[in-house]
Amino acid sequence: MFRRNDTMKLFRATLVAVVLVALCVSSLMNAPAVAAAPKTITVATDATWPPMEFVDAQKNIVGFDIDFLKAAAKEGGFEVVFKNTAWDGIFAGIEAGKYDAIISSVTITDERKKTMDFSDPYINAGQILVVPKKDKTTKKLADLKGKKVGAQIGTTGAMEIKKNAGVELKTYDEIGLAFEDMAADRIAAVVCDTPVAANYALQRNEYKKNFKIVGVPFTEEFYGVVVKKGNKELLELLNKGIRQVKSKGLNKAIEKKWLR
C-alpha cells in the first residue's frame, strides 16, 4: 500500500533537490567570468634593420616595429613573441608554419599580395638615397650611371635600383653591410627606407659626419604586418590593435622615440 506520508516525503525531497539545483545555477550565472588567456602570436622579424628592428647591446630585439606591435597587442588583447629570422627565408617560413606573422619593415606591394595577406598599413616609409658627403653632384638615383649602388637583397630599394638603366645593383644580406662598403668607397651610394637612412646618416656617430641624405623619398611605401594567405582571424586581431594605436595617437610617441 502506498501511504500519504510516503507521498509527502517524496514531494519534499524533490522540492529540496529542485531548490539546490536552482541555487547552483544562480551561483554560476552570477560568478565573475574567467577571462580567456590572451592569444599569443609568434612574429618573425629580421632584426638587422635599425631603427625599425635590431638587436641591442643586451641582446634584446628592439626598434620601432617591435614597440608598435607590442602597443597593438596591448590594445588588441593579444600577446606577441618575436623570433629573429633572416630576411632571405622569412616569407617561406610563414608558408611553412614556423611562425604566425612577420613584422620586418615589409612594404605592401601588389606582387606580394598575391602570395600573402597584409594588415592595415602602420607607417609610410619611402625609399631614399644616401651618399658620402664628399659627393657634391649626385641629386638622384639616375645620376649614378656606371656606378655601384647598394641595397638589401629582395627589398624595394633593390627593385628601384634595377629600374635605372646603367646603375649597377650590389645586394647585401644586411643593410649595415652596404653602409660599411660605402664608408670604404666600395660603392657610391645606398638606397633604403627613409627611417633606416635617417638612422645611419643622421644618428650613428660612425657615419653621420661622412654620409648625407639627398633629395626626397622617391617612392610612397606603406609597411604592413604579414600573415599567411587566408588567415582572416589573425588579420582581424592585428587590425583591431593597429587601428587602436593609430586612433589614440600612440604611434606618435613611438615615432618620436625611434625616428627623430
Regions found by a protein language model. Give the residues of each.
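Extracytoplasmic small-molecule ligand-binding "clamshell" domains
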Residues: 36-105, 114
